A protein has these predicted regions:
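Short N-terminal helix/helix-N-cap motif within the alpha/beta-hydrolase-1
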Residues: 193-195
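Class I (Rossmann-like) S-adenosyl-L-methionine-dependent methyltransferase catalytic domain
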Residues: 7-10, 42-172, 215-310
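A conserved beta-strand element that flanks and buttresses the S-adenosyl-L-methionine
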Residues: 184
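Short amphipathic alpha-helix with an adjacent loop that forms part of the alpha/beta core around
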Residues: 172-178
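A short glycine-rich, Lys/Arg-flanked "PGG" loop and its adjoining helix->strand segment in the class I
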Residues: 198-213
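Short catalytic micro-motifs in class I SAM-dependent methyltransferases
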Residues: 187-191
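Extended alpha-helical heptad-repeat/coiled-coil "stalk" and oligomerization rods
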Residues: 1-51
Length: 310
């Protein structure tokens, strides 16, 4: 065969193999999704996240009980209240950030998470700060405008450090030891699959300077240790914690993975790694009802925040 014809034949053969491989993979994924959707629709209450997820119907007394269980598990728990007047002033001063969240029921919750993280880590001009799993958040641009050397980190960004964006796994951040003053994760930590929750805390301890702070808000603590997954996504079964109950999401969100610790699981799973910090506490916010009264109709669930200092 002529060399050019032979080369063309090899290319066609290779392309055909690639297409067939992609089609087979897509068919397998589609079949898996279809089976999951059927299973989720037929599942009884014991297999549905709404049975276990108390953030959908918050109860202050319930979360106070969880705080007591955390203490019995050996966790340092500090009660704290949102200064509603001060937070209202902050919301007004960050109107642009509020506009990003629109008129959703979680708008005030999202703003509260940023506010609490900033208060916890004492963010001020000149500090180096990383917003972990930032995705499309406008928080870092706000902080940069205020004079901070603020950086956004997300796995979805192009890999490497590119200006103020870092594309990397939160367990392997390409920055030197002790180069960061503060870090926080807002409504993100619960989505860290497999051992990434433990791995991230270890990485934060490496990156933070002595005295630097880490805030994780909300810290999802619930009565039962469970992981919620969407039937509309395919998750590697090995990423589910062995001792957690795995349930189907039955809300409007399609997030593939959301981990809620029980008080005992939190202490057992994270305790050794958190020992890398000089100070660790879980902050229990006890007056979210007052925030709801100020902004009626808001869905609030930042009852707990993990606050650590290097």
């Amino acid at each position: 065969m002529h060399p050019i014809r032979h080369a063309k034949a090899l290319v066609r053969e290779r392309l055909t193999e690639l297409v067939r491989s992609e089609v087979r993979a897509e068919m397998r994924a589609t079949a898996t999704l279809a089976a999951q959707v059927v299973e989720a629709r037929q599942a009884d209450a014991s297999r549905l996240a709404s049975t276990y997820d108390h953030t959908k119907n918050p109860n202050d007394e319930f979360y106070s009980g969880l705080a007591d269980r955390l203490r019995r598990a050996g966790v340092d728990v500090q009660t704290r209240q949102v200064d509603v007047a001060r937070f209202a002033d902050w919301v007004e001063a960050h109107a642009g950030l509020g506009a990003y969240y629109g008129d959703s029921a979680t708008r005030v919750e999202k703003l509260l998470e940023h506010y609490l993280a900033g208060e916890s880590t004492h963010l001020t001009a000149g500090m180096t700060y990383i917003d972990v799993a930032a995705a499309g958040s406008h928080w870092v641009p706000c902080l940069r405008h205020a004079g901070l050397d603020a950086l956004s980190l997300d796995l979805s960004y192009p890999q490497g450090v590119r200006g103020w964006r870092i594309g990397a796994d939160a367990q392997k951040i390409p920055l030197p030891d002790g180069s960061v003053d503060a870090m926080s994760a807002q409504c993100a930590f619960e989505m860290f699959q497999g051992g990434a929750d433990v791995g991230f805390i270890s990485e934060a301890a490496r990156l933070l300077r002595n005295g630097g702070g880490l805030a994780i808000v909300p810290l999802y603590v619930d009565d039962t240790y469970f992981i919620a997954t969407s039937p509309y996504t395919v998750v590697d079964p090995d990423s589910f914690d062995e001792d957690a109950t795995v349930v189907w999401r039955d809300d409007e969100y399609d997030a593939p993975f959301s981990r809620h610790y029980s008080p005992e699981a939190l202490a057992d799973r994270l305790g050794d790694t958190l020992a890398l910090f000089s100070q660790v506490r879980v902050v229990h916010m006890t007056n979210l009802e007052s925030v709801r009264e100020r902004w009626p109709g808001s869905r609030l669930y930042a009852y707990f925040m993990l606050e650590s200092r290097k």
